[in-house]
Amino acid sequence: MDYAEMLDRQKHIRNFSIIAHIDHGKSTLADRILEMTDTIAKRDMQAQVLDDMELERERGITIKLNAVELHYHAKDGETYIFHLIDTPGHVDFSYEVSRSLAACEGALLVVDAAQGVEAQTLANVYLAVDDDLEIVPVINKIDLPSAQPDVVKAEIEEMIGLDASEAVLASAKSGIGIEEILEKLVTDVPAPTGDLEAPLKALIFDSNYDSYRGVVLNIRVVDGTVKVGDKIRLMNSGKEFEVTEVGVMSPKAVKRDFLMVGDVGYITASIKTIQDTRVGDTVTLADNPADAPLDGYRHIQPMVYSGMYPVDNAKFNDLREALEKLQLNDAALEFEPESSQALGFGFRCGFLGLLHMDVVQERLEREFNLDLIMTAPSVDYHVALTDGTEEVIDNPSEMPETSNISEVKEPYVKASIMVPNDYVGAVMELAQRKRGEFVTMDYLDTYRVNVIYNMPLSEIIFDFFDDLKSNTKGYASFDYEVTGYRASDLVKIDILLNGEAVDALSFIVHRDFAFERSRVIVGKLKETIPRQQFEVPIQAAIGNKIIARSTVKAFRKNVLAKCYGGDITRKRKLLEKQKAGKKRMKSVGSVEVPQEAFMSILKMNDEDTKGK
């Protein structure tokens, strides 16, 4: 292809993402667009084509971003090349969204005609506005009996500030308005601006590991071209490799001769060491490098930390390899080795939220065939010590002694909850129970309210989302951003089994809730720890003070079975002998803690602590 043809091709490229709240029809719209552009044969068509991970299809949510190339014959007689990057909608995966948007010039904003603008819609739109993307509003599901397109148009104009008079009315399920959306992409979304003759500059927006080809890099070419045989350099790590294959996803991998400005595709270069690549790095040519790397992405801070241990300690290295491979595909995951007296060797992992943690655990268990134990999640605390130093603690068992602490700060978030009028009371009650501070309340229209609270992150990560959904019959939507750290009266609670603290069961809680939470946890542990041959006391303690206790009764043989009547002293002698044996057993016995015991702490809901 000569220079003029390449320039012409560049004018016909359109890169766009689809952004929306969970369940507003993103993946279905992507399916219809693939169908309309004949990218997928009718016989291969299935719902949510781009959600190719088994877990995504099972849960019906998008977890990973996905990029596909489509060809569209527009009404002006020209053929356009579309690169569609599908994005997740859940708050835990907003990092995936920000990475997708950095590879685009435009975005389709999909809003449900019945539900209107929701919290996550706003959060993702602001990401798109920050990246200066051209936003095309689409009102989806207009064939629903409860659809109110005019109300939703007004909402888009009021809340987002976009002109919605030209918004496309569509139904992804029935295929209404799909052609109009494609025409809008041609006319409204600009072609990529980039210099074909400049040195290669490409942004790595995702990567994954293939056991035959090594690391596969998904890139968006910003300047220049790249072809098989080129020697490339990764600008952050400085490592150099020779390109062995280039291509695009359509939606399966299709090999190409080269990738040029505006293309979204993949390259392989026999990269065997996972540590050499990082999402957000810039690819350039080794013999003609670019002056400066692209901006890349802001480094994302994990919100939630949890210990991850293999059930079989011999699998420690397998877990390390699995985490390294998964990190290629999930840039927000962080981990470092740690050890626990109770669980042996494992890793302290950082996640963006509980759903992210759940998904990582499930992917490790499915894709790498591992059996894992996860400890209760916690956030990171800033602990000021009496000697004037400060420590950041993300593991409750590392909390210093109370006498050495001058204050503990915990992360706070600004939570915005959109909810129908009827449920405002229930939401406010829930937020206050979770130590929330009311900030403001805005009426979006006659029947919906946006309530804003400042809340501690530690109260949100457990089960706030589930409680919110059950208290509002599923109508509330929720988004949060971390605002900073505040001093709180927090205490560390140790759980003792048979008089010994189990480091993996420690947790940090506000002093006001210490007593109730301890009582609930001790009760739950009593149900999950199996009975032993000796009595097992379960205690919760703050420092040396025991604040809750329960006992798992011992199994005992009926030693009096062979005594038919007779002297009481004979019976007493047998009972004393049994008691002494149990005592000796207790002093040397150790208690196995099953995985359910760790999970019971996770699943401690408000019903357990309410009103006690």
UniProtKB/Swiss-Prot annotation:
InterPro entries registered for this protein in UniProt: EF-4, EFG_III/V, EFG_V-like, EFTu-like_2, LepA_C_sf, LepA_CTD, LepA_IV, P-loop_NTPase
Reactions that this protein is recorded to catalyse: GTP + H2O = GDP + phosphate + H(+)
E.C. number: 3.6.5.n1
Family of this protein: Belongs to the TRAFAC class translation factor GTPase superfamily. Classic translation factor GTPase family. LepA subfamily.
GO cellular component: plasma membrane
Occurrences of domain tr-type G (ranges): 11-193
PANTHER family referenced in this protein's UniProt entry, alphabetically: TRANSLATION FACTOR GUF1 HOMOLOG, CHLOROPLASTIC, TRANSLATION FACTOR GUF1-RELATED
SMART domains: EFG_C (SM00838)
Lineage, highest ranks first: Bacteria, Bacillati, Bacillota, Bacilli, Lactobacillales
Function: Required for accurate and efficient protein synthesis under certain stress conditions. May act as a fidelity factor of the translation reaction, by catalyzing a one-codon backward translocation of tRNAs on improperly translocated ribosomes. Back-translocation proceeds from a post-translocation (POST) complex to a pre-translocation (PRE) complex, thus giving elongation factor G a second chance to translocate the tRNAs correctly. Binds to ribosomes in a GTP-dependent manner.
Pfam families: EFG_C (PF00679), GTP_EFTU (PF00009), GTP_EFTU_D2 (PF03144), LepA_C (PF06421)
Name of protein: Elongation factor 4
Organism of this sequence: Latilactobacillus sakei subsp. sakei (strain 23K)
Membrane topology according to the record: Peripheral membrane protein
Binding site for GTP: 23-28, 140-143
